[in-house]
Every structure is written in C-alpha cells, then in structure tokens.
C-alpha cells in the first residue's frame, strides 16, 4: 500500500509534465534580452529538476532499491525490455562523451548564450520523457496529456493569427505579418510545434464525430465538442500555413498520411464479414480520384493549370472527407486503408 507521500510525489510528477506541456509553448519573456528559447529552457530545466526531486523522494519512500533485480537483462520485467529504453540510454552516453571530449565542455554542457541547447537541456528533455514513460499507466492520464497539448496550442495559434492580421501589440524587430512567429519567435518553430498537435486534434474530431453519428439521439455536448475541435484545427492549420515554412508543411503532410494510414489499418480487422460491400466502398472512393487525375490535363488545357489544380484538389478533399465519414459510420473498414494509399499515390502523381 502506497503512503500519502508517495501519492503526493506521483501527483507532483504528473503536474510537472502537464505544466511543461502547457507552459513551455506559451511562455516568453519580453523583459529579457533573448525573449524566447533561453527563457523557455530555463523554465523547462527547473520543471525537470523538481520532477527529479519528487521521483527521488518517492523512490526512497517506497524503498525502490529493493527492485534492483529488475535491472538484470535476464529478468522478463526488466526495464531494458521496454521500447526506446536502450536508444535513449545510447543517446545519453553519446551526449556525455561528446561533452566530455568537447573543445569547450562548458558550452557543450550549458549551451550557447543565444540558444541554450546544450547537454543539460537535452537531459531535461530526456528526464521528462522518462518520467512520463514510467508513470503514465491509465487512459485518464493519456487523455489529460492530449487535452493539455491541444489547449496549449490554442493561444499559440491565436497569437499567430493576430500577427498575420497586423494586430500584434508587441513591436518586434522583424516582419511577423508575412511569416508569423507567435510565441516561438521563429516561423519554423511555431509551425513545427503545431504540426505535432494537429494529429491529436484530428483524433479528437474523429472521436467526437463518431459519437454524433453513432448515438441514436443527438447530444448537444458532442456537437459542441466537435465544433470546438474543428475550430482549434482550423486555427492550427491557418497558423501553419501563414508561417510560410515549407519543411513543417511537408512534415504535416507526411504526418497526416501516416496518422490516417495507421488509423485505417487498425480498423481493418474490425470490418466484419461484409467483404463485397467493403470492396465496393473502397472502389467508390478511388473512382473520383482516378477520374480527376485523367480529366486534369483536359481541364488544364481548357481553363488553365490553376483551375485544374483546384479541381483535382477539390476531388481529393471530398474523397478524404468521405473516408472519415465512412470511418465514423463503420462502413468499408476492410479496404479503406488501400483506398487511402491509392488516393495519396494519385495525388503525388498529379503533383509530380
């Protein structure tokens, strides 16, 4: 039986990573010289130190040294058998050796004055990751992590929109209207952050729409939830687009493709025995994309490439929407993953 102190330490650990997920993307300090990265990382390092202290107190209270046998590789429950443990240990060793043999060990450890991205910062990342991997055990905790990440993205995205429309109250030295920088101080950084949150928001949208279509009686709470997540997704995508960063846009495209493919493949085994009907659903999604691909040269020669591109992308968007509708309606699950791959290939073929 755990003591009250151990439960308090577990609560402090969870509060630590939730605060990190919420505060680091939003926080910046206009009263310091460097404003963004060093100030964010100073806060992150402090959170990591508090989490380490809470973990050590909990370890002592539980007498965790009695479980030292779990460090043996021969033990089936050993920590070494968990995913990513060995790669993370290898990464820590590489950073330690690189810092030890660096021509400027102090800079390698603490990071540069402008960025503060040194071994100390990397170890802070790893500490928070390790604490989360070791202590997140319930679906409720996972939901809290996802919800916190989505909530943190809202002020970041909204601030980007303010900058784009010229309503930023802060006088930045660079042009943040053509390429928004938001709370990150860099157009690439804000887009790179938001593309990590977009799949989480999209998953909540799928869940909310599924609840709406799956219930016999329409729930106002489900409708409000779906509308809220759709709004959040819209401002996230707009901020990513107005950042003008090509790399994150490519990463977003690859991430959305992978997210959807994993989702559809995971549903393949739950499609039931309606193979003929599921095959028809999959083919029905491919036909519009094939026709759009074949008709695009004709449309391009008639009204121009811009209209042809809009025509093809419109058909692709409608096909993607149809896929998600079929997912929520529990139709065609067996072959939707193949339709998604083929649709992506057709789109890539048109672009190339």
Could you tell me what each predicted segment is?
Residues 1-30, 45-59, 82, 87-105, ...:
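Alpha-helical transmembrane segments of multi-pass inner-membrane proteins
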Residues 34-48:
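Membrane-interface anchor segments at the N-terminal boundary of transmembrane helices
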Residues 61-80, 213, 217:
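Flexible loop linkers connecting adjacent transmembrane helices
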Residues 69-81, 85, 101-113:
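Membrane-helix boundary/helix-loop-helix interface segments in multi-pass membrane proteins
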